[in-house]
């Protein structure tokens, strides 16, 4: 922060120039451009010089929100965002509109693509806040993030002082019209700014995890779009709990280990774990508020983080325990890569870490494009996408602000360039859109990265070029393959930020962020389609408390499936009332057309459900409702649970099957 003593008349001219020249540009969040005489005269003005790619610019948005809630326009304060783009793509007003919507910016914003006001005021870095007095004088300039307390103090003092001089206007006629009203209407099965994807295999199906960032939730579905679980959403929050009550805030990267999905809960500055078996969400790292630690070493929720953007699992060779899992975390806020040790681990240079310890392992914390054999001497620039290639013992990452793909040797910690960026480690402005080798290749703020197992190549979401590119990690050759009308006109993307590749089908799944969709690219047929999601419509108007989905397989020739259901309560003082009816019922009306018939439409929970599956192929859904009475010492509670049993008919499956499934009830 610095105080400014300057010619008030000159500054007033500069502010007038901002407003007058801005008529040639575009305003956002207002119905018409602001006038210095009708709207800004007699106000304390905070000019926020930002570029929407910048993590530090994102970090001050909560500070501005606090400021605007404490001091209204009628009180004499108005905040104006002056978008001063770093990247070429950011100069486009459509791209800026999406960013304003994505980050829920609610104050007026003007797009200054030529950086006219930036130069007039001598601004030198993002973000910078200029505090302007009611007659055009610059009162203070705050450079960088972390000035919330000073901002509140200065605005409070300035308002009191200028009110005593009768120079503050209480007029509140700013024509606000928020950009969010232009967003598509979000339905239960639609996405809003999806960011990251992960593919995994369970016993029966190829599964897809989607971070529906704008709706603050996670979808667990198969790669055909059939949704098993919706976790969190739609409003932001920071709550652990079951899938319905848990809350995220702009979740980004996802990865899976066993039955656990790890989530980079970006704006909660934490790592969350989704337990698919227990159907519960817990916080494993982070305090819920932004940290400023560049070292780490604390355990779990005692360790503060700063804007985790992606996560990946590495199976580290441990001399005593064999392979131990380590969760790698792209910490965009401090320009580092951290590790959460899920078990006791001997790490690089024989450092010992206890299970639950979270520590910085790569990056000095300086925003640079500096490669180095020593991991803590390397400089990263907002790492935003991670992929572990286990057989190579390598981590590859999309280093967004250096516009590069880089690597970490997970045996030693050496950081190297794969492609993109400049040879000068301090030059973070060498971006473009060019195929080539190593530094000759140019990218523009890449965010997503995946490994194509069959091709042995990286696929990169080159976000601000709206393209997907292939990278040979041995030669460093980078080539555009999809997007911006290539290979066909139908291949059009808008800031893709996540990518995942099916190891079985060879399909590429892309989080097409600003198009609010997941695109599926068939690389063999060169066809691109939009993934249609299907959420089973469960009628919960009758008080259904929980929804459960299970999968099983039976022969294409048909057969008999016997299902036994066992109730388990998370609350230890809950138990089934032995004197009350505990029943299941099945919707028989959907069975005949679906290729199955139940031998009974209902019965006590102690009796199995028997399904006769007819000869055929495909997937059949058997819907069940469980009506149970659970009791504590002093009260009994009725509960309804909805179960969707998916029966897959396969050639190599058994024709007679008995299964016992656990229903975990909160």
Which residues make up each language-model segment?
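Thiol-/selenol-based redox modules, centered on thioredoxin-like
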Residues: 133-195, 536-544
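A short beta-strand-turn-helix
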Residues: 21-45, 68
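Residue-level detector of Asp-centered blade-edge/turn motifs that repeat once per structural unit
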Residues: 199-205, 256-258, 313-324, 388-392, ...
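Structural microenvironment flanking redox-active thiols in thiol-disulfide oxidoreductases
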Residues: 59-102, 113-117
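Short active-site neighborhood of thiol/selenol oxidoreductases, capturing the structured segment around
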Residues: 35-58, 79
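Extracellular/lumen-exposed scaffold segments
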Residues: 525-526, 532-666
């Amino acid at each position: 922060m610095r105080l400014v003593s300057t010619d008030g008349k000159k500054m007033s001219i500069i502010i007038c120039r901002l407003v007058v020249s801005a008529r040639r540009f575009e305003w956002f969040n207002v119905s018409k451009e602001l006038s210095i005489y009708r709207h800004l005269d007699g106000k304390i003005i905070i000019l926020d010089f930002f570029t929407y790619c910048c993590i530090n610019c994102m970090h001050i948005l909560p500070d501005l929100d606090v400021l605007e809630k404490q001091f209204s326009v009628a009180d004499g304060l108005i905040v104006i965002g002056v978008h001063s783009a770093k990247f070429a793509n950011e100069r486009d007003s459509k791209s800026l509109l999406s960013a304003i919507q994505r980050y829920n910016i609610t104050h007026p914003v003007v797009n200054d693509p030529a950086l006219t006001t930036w130069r007039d005021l001598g601004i030198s870095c993002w973000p910078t806040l200029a505090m302007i007095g009611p007659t055009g004088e610059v009162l203070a300039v705050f450079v960088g993030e972390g000035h919330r307390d000073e901002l509140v103090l200065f605005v409070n003092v300035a308002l009191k002082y200028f009110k005593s001089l009768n120079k503050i206007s209480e007029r509140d006629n700013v024509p606000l019209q928020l950009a969010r009203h232009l967003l598509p209407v979000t339905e239960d099965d639609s996405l809003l700014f999806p960011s990251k994807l992960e593919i995994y295999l369970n016993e029966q199906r190829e599964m897809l995890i989607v971070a529906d960032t704008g709706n603050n939730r996670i979808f667990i579905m198969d790669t055909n779009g059939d949704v098993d679980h919706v976790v969190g959403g739609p409003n932001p929050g920071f709550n652990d709990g079951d899938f319905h009550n848990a809350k995220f805030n702009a979740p980004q990267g996802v990865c899976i280990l066993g039955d656990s999905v790890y989530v980079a809960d970006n704006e909660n500055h934490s790592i969350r774990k989704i337990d698919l078996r227990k159907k519960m969400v817990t916080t494993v790292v982070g305090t819920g508020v932004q940290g400023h630690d560049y070292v780490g070493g604390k355990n779990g929720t005692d360790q503060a983080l700063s804007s985790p953007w992606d996560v990946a699992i590495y199976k580290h060779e441990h001399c005593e325990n064999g392979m131990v899992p380590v969760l790698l975390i792209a910490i965009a806020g401090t320009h580092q890569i951290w590790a959460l040790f899920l078990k006791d681990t001997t790490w690089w240079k024989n450092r010992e870490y206890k299970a639950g310890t979270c520590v910085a392992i790569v990056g000095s914390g300086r925003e640079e494009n500096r490669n180095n054999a020593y991991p803590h001497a390397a400089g990263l620039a907002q790492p935003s996408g991670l992929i572990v290639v286990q057989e190579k013992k390598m981590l590859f990452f999309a280093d967004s602000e250096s516009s590069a793909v880089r690597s970490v040797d997970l045996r030693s910690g050496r950081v190297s360039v794969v492609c993109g960026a400049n040879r000068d480690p301090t030059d973070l402005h060498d971006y473009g859109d060019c195929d080539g080798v190593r530094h000759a290749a140019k990218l523009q703020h890449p965010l997503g990265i995946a490994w194509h197992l069959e091709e042995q190549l990286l696929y990169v979401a080159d976000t601000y070029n709206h393209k997907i590119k292939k990278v040979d990690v041995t030669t460093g050759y980078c080539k555009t393959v999809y997007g911006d009308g290539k290979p066909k006109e139908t291949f059009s993307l808008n800031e893709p930020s996540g990518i995942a590749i099916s190891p079985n089908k060879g399909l590429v799944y892309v989080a097409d962020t600003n198009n609010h969709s997941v695109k599926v690219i068939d690389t063999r047929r060169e066809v691109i389609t939009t993934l249609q999601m299907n959420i089973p419509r469960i009628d919960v108007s009758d008080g259904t408390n929980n929804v459960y989905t299970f999968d099983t397989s039976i022969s294409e020739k048909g057969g008999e499936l016997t299902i036994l259901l066992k109730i388990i309560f998370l609350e230890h003082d809950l138990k089934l009332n032995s004197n009350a009816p505990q029943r299941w019922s099945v919707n028989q009306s959907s069975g005949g057309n679906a290729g199955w018939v139940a031998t009974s439409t209902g019965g006590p929970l102690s009796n199995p459900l028997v399904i006769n599956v007819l000869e055929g192929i495909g997937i059949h859904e058997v819907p069940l409702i469980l009506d149970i009475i659970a009791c504590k010492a002093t009260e009994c509670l009725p509960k309804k649970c909805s179960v969707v049993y998916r029966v897959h008919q396969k050639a190599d499956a058994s024709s007679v099957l008995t299964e016992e499934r656990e229903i975990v009830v909160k």
